[in-house]
């Protein structure tokens, strides 16, 4: 029986997705799979945007941000009748293997294809938010972190010149990993993340102490899951006398050349994904834990909120920000 494997990217784009597409295609070909690409994620599967993927298609993309397969969100895919159409579009081409690169929403769609239609699916975690359970790191997190650090350095220049307190809102959805790591690596002076209580009075007290100790500017990292940074700015104004500004980094965090770490991680995850499918396993995601490649059921990845033990890192960030 001929083995045919399709690749799609879904949800928000993340640096490293192209490296994962490239490695998946190359390794799948090595194992004897005929490789197909699906444009625009599940929307493209539904609209039959499925095409044979040649080696030329993945040539020269390892260092490119975004995704050459494009990505989109599909509300229709949440309905069983549309998922059946999408699955049939695969089956009529003889495709029974699928690698899905994306976040938890992408995993839910993949798990339904596996459960309802028997499509042999493996997920690769691609999201800058680092909010997928079953893996220490997701594709794009490291690159995004470095983008934030670069922005912090520039913002610190103006904060220092004007003796200001600047709040920087970063992405992450419900997870504070980006803000936490950026605070530690970038020498942040305060942090607010959704996993921990964030009383404005505590932050204000910390900033006042910095002023007493002769510090004349502050950089505070605010994870988007905490709330609107402008609201936080207004509340903080009632507690401290220094001039406050807010910066929302926004979609610059999604783009850029993927870091070496993300390219290697993408390649390792892709190799594991194809290896798993070649062995006849499916319905799982691949991840990295303690530098080892692992798999976990997609169902588990979809149903469990990622709750890492972040207390020690949070305490470290607070200690270093004094």
UniProtKB/Swiss-Prot annotation:
The active site is at residue 129. Substrate binds at residues 127-129, 164, 171-173, 224, 245, 251-254. ATP binds at residues 12, 73-74, 103-106. It is found in: Cytoplasm. Its cofactor is Mg(2+). This is ATP-dependent 6-phosphofructokinase. Homotetramer. Mg(2+) binds at residue 104. Catalyzes the phosphorylation of D-fructose 6-phosphate to fructose 1,6-bisphosphate by ATP, the first committing step of glycolysis. Belongs to the phosphofructokinase type A (PFKA) family. ATP-dependent PFK group I subfamily. Prokaryotic clade 'B1' sub-subfamily. Signal peptide: none annotated. HAMAP family: Phosphofructokinase_I_B1. Gene3D superfamilies: 3.40.50.450, Phosphofructokinase domain (3.40.50.460). Pfam families: PFK (PF00365). Pathway: Carbohydrate degradation; glycolysis; D-glyceraldehyde 3-phosphate and glycerone phosphate from D-glucose: step 3/4. Allosterically activated by ADP and other diphosphonucleosides, and allosterically inhibited by phosphoenolpyruvate. ADP binds at residues 22-26, 156, 187-189, 215-217. The keyword Ion transport does not apply. InterPro entries: ATP_PFK (IPR022953), ATP_PFK_prok-type (IPR012003), PFKA_ATP_prok (IPR012828), Phosphofructokinase_CS (IPR015912), Phosphofructokinase_dom (IPR000023), PKF_sf (IPR035966). The keyword Kinase applies. It catalyses: beta-D-fructose 6-phosphate + ATP = beta-D-fructose 1,6-bisphosphate + ADP + H(+). GO terms for molecular function: 6-phosphofructokinase activity; ATP binding; fructose-6-phosphate binding; metal ion binding. GO terms for biological process: canonical glycolysis; fructose 1,6-bisphosphate metabolic process; fructose 6-phosphate metabolic process. Keywords: Allosteric enzyme, ATP-binding, Cytoplasm, Glycolysis, Kinase, Magnesium, Metal-binding, Nucleotide-binding, Transferase. PANTHER family: ATP-DEPENDENT 6-PHOSPHOFRUCTOKINASE, PHOSPHOFRUCTOKINASE.
């Amino acid at each position: 029986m001929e083995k045919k494997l399709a690749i799609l990217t879904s949800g928000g784009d993340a640096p490293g997705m192209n490296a994962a597409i490239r490695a998946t295609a190359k390794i799948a070909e090595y194992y004897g799979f005929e490789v197909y690409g699906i444009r625009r994620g599940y929307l493209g599967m539904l609209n039959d945007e499925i095409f044979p993927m040649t080696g030329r298609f993945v040539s020269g993309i390892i260092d490119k941000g975004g995704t050459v397969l494009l990505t989109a969100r599909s509300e229709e895919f949440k309905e069983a009748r549309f998922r059946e159409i999408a699955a049939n579009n695969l089956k009529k081409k003889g495709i029974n293997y699928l690698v899905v690169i994306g976040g938890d929403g992408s995993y839910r769609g993949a798990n339904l294809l596996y459960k309802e239609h028997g499509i042999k699916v493996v997920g690769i975690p691609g999201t800058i938010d680092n909010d997928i359970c079953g893996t220490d790191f997701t594709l794009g997190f490291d690159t995004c972190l470095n983008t934030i650090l670069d922005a912090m350095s520039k913002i610190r220049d103006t904060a220092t010149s004007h003796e200001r307190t600047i709040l920087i809102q970063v992405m992450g959805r419900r997870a504070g990993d980006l803000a936490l790591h950026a605070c530690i690596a970038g020498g942040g002076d305060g942090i607010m993340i959704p996993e921990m209580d964030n009383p404005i009075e505590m932050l204000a007290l910390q900033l006042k102490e910095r002023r007493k100790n002769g510090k004349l500017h502050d950089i505070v990292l605010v994870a988007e899951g905490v709330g609107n940074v402008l609201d936080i700015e207004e509340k903080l104004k009632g507690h401290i006398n220094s001039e406050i500004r807010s910066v929302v980094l926004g979609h610059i965090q999604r783009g850029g050349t993927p870091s070496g770490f993300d390219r290697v991680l993408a390649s390792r995850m892709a190799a594991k994904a194809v290896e798993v499918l070649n062995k006849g396993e499916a319905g799982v995601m691949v991840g990295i834990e303690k530098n080892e490649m692992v798999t976990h059921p997609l169902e588990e990845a979809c149903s469990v909120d990622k709750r890492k033990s972040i207390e020690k890192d949070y305490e470290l960030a607070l200690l270093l920000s004094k």
